[in-house]
A protein has these predicted regions:
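Amphipathic alpha-helical assembly/interaction segments
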Residues: 1-147
Length: 147
């Protein structure tokens, strides 16, 4: 399993899965934007652990999040989700790179800052929607139990 401390910030996995599962049905575009902005705080290792588990066809995934250890039993057909998980992971990495490279607002003019912020929020909304789709399908097929 990948290093848990790499990301440095953790999120409660059960809460993430439940929240994103509901998001597809309940949230407006504006709410999805807010959710997208929270992705910066999400744990990269969680997505990595899921992706690796699906590739290896493991039946369990164990990792830490929110200061707790989780042991997740995967059910059903796992192969279906591999591409979606990889896409989510790639989107997250692209988002992080975008944040670090393009969101240095201190030296920008107000106009440029507004334009960058608008682009950033559109990107967040797209990624938030994508994450909701794959996590919703995973949530229906996993049993989450705290150790």
């Amino acid at each position: 399993m990948s290093s848990i401390s790499k990301a440095g910030i953790f999120i409660d996995v059960k809460q993430l899965l439940e929240f994103t599962y509901r998001m597809n049905k309940e949230m407006s575009i504006a709410d999805r934007r807010d959710f997208g902005s929270q992705l910066i705080r999400y744990n990269l290792d969680m997505i990595t652990a899921f992706t690796m588990a699906f590739h290896r066809r493991d039946e369990r995934v164990a990792f830490e999040a929110g200061g707790k250890s989780y042991d997740i039993q995967l059910k059903g057909e796992k192969r279906f989700h591999v591409d979606a998980l990889e896409a989510a992971f790639d989107s997250y990495q692209a988002l992080m790179e975008f944040c670090f490279e393009n969101l240095t607002f201190s030296r920008m003019s107000a106009r440029k800052r507004r334009r960058r912020h608008k682009h950033f929020m559109e990107l967040m909304a797209k990624i938030g929607t994508g994450i909701a789709k794959w996590s919703g399908s995973i949530y229906k097929q996993v049993v989450v139990s705290e150790k």
